[in-house]
C-alpha cells in the first residue's frame, strides 16, 4: 500500500470541510461505516459519508476556466488519492490557493502547477442549513409567500380596487356632461338625474374604499403577527454566541424595527401602489380627450421617479446613521438602567449624563438631517406637480380657445389627471417611509438571517445517564481569539462528584458551557453516554442538565413560577421538596405570599442569597442527571451555605455533579478534583492526594486560602 493510502486524504478532507460548515464529524465512525475494506474512502463512499453528515454534495466535471464560477471551498478529486481543497481562484493573476492535504498547509499554485495537478473532477459542498438559510433569507421577498398564502384576500382587494377606479372614472364624466350639456341647454331634469347618480356613486365609492381598507388592514395584520411570532421564536433559537457578540440595546433596536414594517404594511403606501397599477384605464380615456395633454402627464412621471432616485441614496445613508445612533442610545440606556446600583454607588451620574447628552444630541442632529432632506424631497415633488399644472392650464386653455377641447372635457381631463398624479405624489412623499422600511428589513434580517442552533436530524435520546467524556478538546470563542481550552482529555463517570478549581481565566466555566452545548469545540469531541454533543439536540440535552451560576437571573414572576419554569405543570410538592434541598423553604414560608410572592424584575425583591437558593431549587426540581454548580455558593452567607452543604449528599445522589469553585473548602469532599491552569488540566486527584504534593498548584491555592 503506497503512502497516499496510509493517510486517507479523503477522510481528512471531509473532516476539514465539515468543520468549515460547522458540522461535527467523528473520523473513526466515518471510517467504520464507509471504509469497510480499509483502503480509504473512494469517490462513492466519500459522497455517501458527506451526505450522512447532512452535507449537500455534488460531483461535477469542470474545465479550469470555469472554476472561478463555482462555490468554494471545494474538493478536487484525484484518482491517485492525493486530493486537495481548492479555496480561492484568482483569474487575473492566474493563481490558485489550495489546502494541501499531504503537507497540511495552504499553498499558492501558479497556472502551470495547478494544471499539472488538476484532473477535472471536483466535488461541490454546502451545508443543508446554509442552503435552507439562503432560501429562507429575510428580505422583501419574504413577503411573497405571505401574499400567496393570503392570495384570496388580496384578490378581493384587487377586485375592490378595480371598482373604485371605475367609480373614479365615472365622476369626471358626470362633470363633463354637466358643463357641456346641462349648463348650455338648461337641462334641469338631466341635472337631477346626474345628481342622483353621482350621489349613488359617491356612497358606493365610500363603502368600497372603507371595505378595501378593512380587508387590507386585516390581511396585513395577519402577516404582522406571523412576522412578529417568527422573529421572537428565531431570537430565542439563536446560539448564545450571537448575544455575546452584540450589545443588548442593539438587538432590542433591531427587534423594534418591526414597528416600522408594521406601520408601512398598514399605511396607505400599498393601496397607493394598487391605485397606480390601474392608472392605465385613465390614460386611455385621457388620450381620447387630448393626446397633447396626456403626453405632458406622461413626461412628468419620469421626473417624479428621477427626483426620488436622486434623493434616495442620500436619504438612505442618513436614515442608516440615524438608526446606528438610536441603537447606541438604546444600548447605553439599557446598560445604565442595568448598572444603576453601580452608577449611584460610585456617584458617576454627572459623567453618565454627559455621555447621554452627547449621544442624544448626535441622534437629534441625525434625525434633523433626515427631516431636512425629506422636506427637500417633498418640495421637489410639489414643484414638479405645480409645473405640470401650469403647463396643462396654459395648453388646455389654448385647446379650448381653438375649439379642439370643450370646457367640460378640460375639467374632466384635469380630474382624471389628478387620479393618476395623486397616488404618484403619495408614493413619492412616502418614499422616506419606504427607505426606512428597507433599512428596517435589512436590520431585522441581521436577526432573522443569523443561523439558529440546529435541531433537525439531531440525537434526542429519552434520558441520559451522566457519563461525560472530553476527548482532545481544543476551543476558542472566536477564530482570532486566544485558545481557552487546549488538549483537554477528561472522563467523568456516572454519579461522580467532580470539583474543578484554578485561577480566574483558566477555562473552568468554558468547560461546563461545552457540556451544555452552548459552543462546539474547534477540535475534539464532548460525549455524554458516548454520544457526540455536536450531533445532539440542544433542548433535549439542556432539559436534563441543571445549572446554577454565580449570578442567576430570576423572571418577574412568583417564586413557584420561577422554580417550576421548565415544567409549569409540576406539582407543588415537587417544588417544595426542591426548595427544601436548596435551603430556600424556610425563608419562602416567612414571606407574606409564600411561594406566590412576586420576586420583581431579575429577582430585585429578594436578597442575593435568597435569589441564589431559588436558582438552586430551580436547577434541582427537574431531577437532572447532570448538575453543574458554577460558583453557585459564593454569594451565600455561611448559614445558607451550611444548609446547602449539609444537603449535598441528597443533592448529589443519583446524578453526576460538577462543582466549580474558588473557595476550595467547597470541593474538598468531591470524588475527584480537577485543577486547571491556562486552559489545561495540570493536576487531578482527591483533596488529600493533591495536598500531599507540596509543589502542586492546588497546595499553593489551598495555602493562600488558609492564610
UniProtKB/Swiss-Prot annotation:
It is a multi-pass membrane protein. Residues 468-703 form the ABC transporter domain. It comes from the Bacteria. One of its GO terms (cellular component) is plasma membrane. Its main location: membrane. Signal peptide: none annotated. Keywords: ATP-binding, Cell inner membrane, Cell membrane, Hydrolase, Membrane, Nucleotide-binding, Transmembrane, Transmembrane helix, Transport. Belongs to the ABC transporter superfamily. Protein-1 exporter (TC 3.A.1.109) family. NCBIfam families: type_I_sec_HlyB. In HlyB the peptidase C39 domain, the ATP-binding domain (NBD) and the transmembrane domain (TMD) are fused. This is Alpha-hemolysin translocation ATP-binding protein HlyB.
Amino acid at each position: 500500500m503506497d503512502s497516499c493510502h496510509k493517510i486517507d486524504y479523503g477522510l481528512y478532507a471531509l473532516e476539514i470541510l465539515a468543520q468549515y460548515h460547522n458540522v461535527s464529524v467523528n473520523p473513526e465512525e466515518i471510517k467504520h461505516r464507509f471504509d469497510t475494506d480499509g483502503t480509504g474512502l473512494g469517490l462513492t463512499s466519500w459522497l455517501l459519508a458527506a451526505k450522512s453528515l447532512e452535507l449537500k454534495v455534488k460531483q461535477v466535471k469542470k474545465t479550469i476556466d470555469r472554476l472561478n464560477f463555482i462555490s468554494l471551498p471545494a474538493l478536487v478529486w484525484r484518482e491517485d488519492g492525493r486530493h486537495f481543497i481548492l479555496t480561492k481562484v484568482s483569474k487575473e493573476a492566474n493563481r490558485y490557493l489550495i489546502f494541501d492535504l499531504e503537507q497540511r498547509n495552504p499553498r499558492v499554485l501558479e497556472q502551470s502547477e495547478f494544471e499539472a495537478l488538476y484532473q477535472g473532477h471536483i466535488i461541490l459542498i454546502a451545508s443543508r442549513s446554509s442552503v435552507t438559510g439562503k432560501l429562507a433569507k429575510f428580505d422583501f421577498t419574504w413577503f411573497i409567500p405571505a401574499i400567496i398564502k393570503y392570495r384570496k384576500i388580496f384578490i378581493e382587494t384587487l377586485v375592490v380596487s378595480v371598482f373604485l377606479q371605475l367609480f373614479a372614472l365615472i365622476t369626471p364624466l358626470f362633470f363633463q356632461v354637466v358643463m357641456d350639456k346641462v349648463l348650455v341647454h338648461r337641462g334641469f331634469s338631466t341635472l337631477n338625474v346626474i345628481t342622483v347618480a353621482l350621489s349613488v356613486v359617491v356612497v358606493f365609492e365610500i363603502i368600497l374604499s372603507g371595505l378595501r381598507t378593512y380587508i387590507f388592514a386585516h390581511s396585513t395584520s395577519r402577516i404582522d403577527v406571523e412576522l412578529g411570532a417568527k422573529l421572537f421564536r428565531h431570537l430565542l433559537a439563536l446560539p448564545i454566541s450571537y448575544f455575546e457578540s452584540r450589545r443588548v440595546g442593539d438587538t432590542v433596536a433591531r427587534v423594534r424595527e418591526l414597528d416600522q414594517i408594521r406601520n408601512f404594511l398598514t399605511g396607505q403606501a400599498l393601496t397607493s401602489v394598487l391605485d397606480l397599477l390601474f392608472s392605465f384605464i385613465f390614460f386611455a380615456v385621457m388620450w381620447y380627450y387630448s393626446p397633447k395633454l396626456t403626453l405632458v402627464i406622461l413626461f412628468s412621471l419620469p421626473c417624479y421617479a428621477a427626483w426620488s432616485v436622486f434623493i434616495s441614496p442620500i436619504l438612505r445613508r442618513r436614515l442608516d446613521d440615524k438608526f446606528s445612533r438610536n441603537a447606541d442610545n438604546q444600548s447605553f440606556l439599557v446598560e445604565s438602567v442595568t448598572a444603576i446600583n453601580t452608577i449611584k454607588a460610585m456617584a458617576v451620574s454627572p459623567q453618565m449624563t454627559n455621555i447621554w447628552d452627547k449621544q442624544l444630541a448626535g441622534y437629534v442632529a441625525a434625525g434633523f438631517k433626515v427631516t431636512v432632506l425629506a422636506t427637500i424631497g417633498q418640495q421637489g415633488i410639489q414643484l414638479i406637480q405645480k409645473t405640470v399644472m401650469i403647463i396643462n392650464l396654459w395648453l388646455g386653455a389654448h385647446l379650448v380657445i381653438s375649439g379642439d377641447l370643450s370646457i367640460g372635457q378640460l375639467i374632466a381631463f384635469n380630474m382624471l389627471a389628478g387620479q393618476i398624479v395623486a397616488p404618484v405624489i403619495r408614493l413619492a412623499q412616502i418614499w422616506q417611509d419606504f427607505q426606512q422600511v428597507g433599512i428596517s428589513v435589512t436590520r431585522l434580517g441581521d436577526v432573522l438571517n443569523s443561523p439558529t442552533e440546529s435541531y433537525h436530524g439531531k440525537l434526542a435520546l429519552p434520558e441520559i445517564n451522566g457519563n461525560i467524556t472530553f476527548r482532545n478538546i481544543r476551543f476558542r470563542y472566536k477564530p482570532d481569539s486566544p485558545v481557552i481550552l487546549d488538549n483537554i482529555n477528561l472522563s467523568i463517570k456516572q454519579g461522580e462528584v467532580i470539583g474543578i478549581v484554578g485561577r480566574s481565566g483558566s477555562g473552568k466555566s468554558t468547560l461546563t458551557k461545552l457540556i451544555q452545548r452552548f459552543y462546539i469545540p474547534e477540535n475534539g469531541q464532548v460525549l455524554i453516554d458516548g454520544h457526540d454533543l455536536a450531533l445532539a439536540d440542544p433542548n433535549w440535552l439542556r432539559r436534563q442538565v441543571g445549572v446554577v451560576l454565580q449570578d442567576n437571573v430570576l423572571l418577574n414572576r412568583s417564586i413557584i413560577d420561577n422554580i417550576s419554569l421548565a415544567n409549569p405543570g409540576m406539582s407543588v410538592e415537587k417544588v417544595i421538596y426542591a426548595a427544601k434541598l436548596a435551603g430556600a423553604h424556610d425563608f419562602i414560608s416567612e414571606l407574606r405570599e409564600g411561594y406566590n410572592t412576586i420576586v420583581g424584575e431579575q429577582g430585585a425583591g429578594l436578597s442575593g442569597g435568597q435569589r441564589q437558593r431559588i436558582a438552586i431549587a430551580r436547577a434541582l426540581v427537574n431531577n437532572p442527571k447532570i448538575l453543574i454548580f458554577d460558583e453557585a455558593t459564593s454569594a451565600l452567607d455561611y448559614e445558607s451555605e451550611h444548609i446547602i452543604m449539609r444537603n449535598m449528599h441528597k443533592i448529589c445522589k443519583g446524578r453526576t455533579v460538577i462543582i466549580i469553585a474558588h473557595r476550595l473548602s467547597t470541593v474538598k469532599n468531591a470524588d475527584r478534583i480537577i485543577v486547571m491552569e491556562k486552559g489545561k488540566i495540570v493536576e487531578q486527584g482527591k483533596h488529600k492526594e493533591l495536598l500531599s504534593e507540596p509543589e502542586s498548584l492546588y497546595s499553593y491555592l489551598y495555602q493562600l486560602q488558609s492564610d
